Amino acid sequence: MQVVFSPGAEIKFEGANNFRELGGYRAADGRRVKYGLLYRGGNLDLLKSEADHARLASLGLREILDLRSAGESAAHPDPAVPGAHYQRVCGMRNADGTEMDFSGQGIERLDRKSLRQEKEAFERSVGRPVHDFEWFSALYREMPFRNPAYHALFALLEGRRVPVLFHCSCGKDRTGIGAMLILLALGVSRADALVDYMLTNVYRREIIERFLADKPAAERDLLLPVEGVSEPMGAGAIDEILRRYPSYEAYFADEFGLDAARLKALRDFYLE
């Protein structure tokens, strides 16, 4: 018996949170995204129990797309899932094209050198000092463009290699932007795409609250994206599309080669 979830509902696991599917969201033409095909999540290494492994296997996954860096994946490797093909394509990259590594050691290295250099380069481009939040928002706005991870994701969708699970470490940033792009491609509204994006703060509420508990109140909004997501950052990423293109359809045609015929075929397959 297939279990049907309401749009954005969390799929419960003992060891992980923020695991859900994209089924149920309504597109502009009145159809809804099909259930049981498009899954999003975080670190699968957190699924330790037999019950969690059985639950994951029950999804019948054909593809797992890991959006993490090599360092993150090596530190917390995905478990083998029967019948699922695994590939890894990092979802965030530095200006020079190298992977942005959010593993423990990677973050330490980034803090010391790479992130500082990236931020300084951004400040030179805008001609003034910027706050970390503004700089990271700028990184977010670049994520939908020329991103090999999202090209791999849409190739799986067009190839109908589903059910597919795409995930990163927390299921919020690289995964969240990817999920919004899928929903927009299927004709779901910007508002509903952002609703799905912001649900991370619901399913990671306890983690976020623990992290922010000892932080100054004036800094909590700025620090929220460390463990949660920021609506201005998520909105900024997809609104940047309309700043560069006259429509989402024009973006999908130029970025992924999804002309009108291919976009219609994608929607006909994933909507009902």
Question: Each PLM stretch: what is its role?
Answer:
Residues M1-L165, I177-E272:
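Cys-dependent protein tyrosine phosphatase-like superfamily
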Residues C170, R174-T175:
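Ser/Thr-glycine-rich phosphate-binding loops at phosphate-binding pockets of nucleotides
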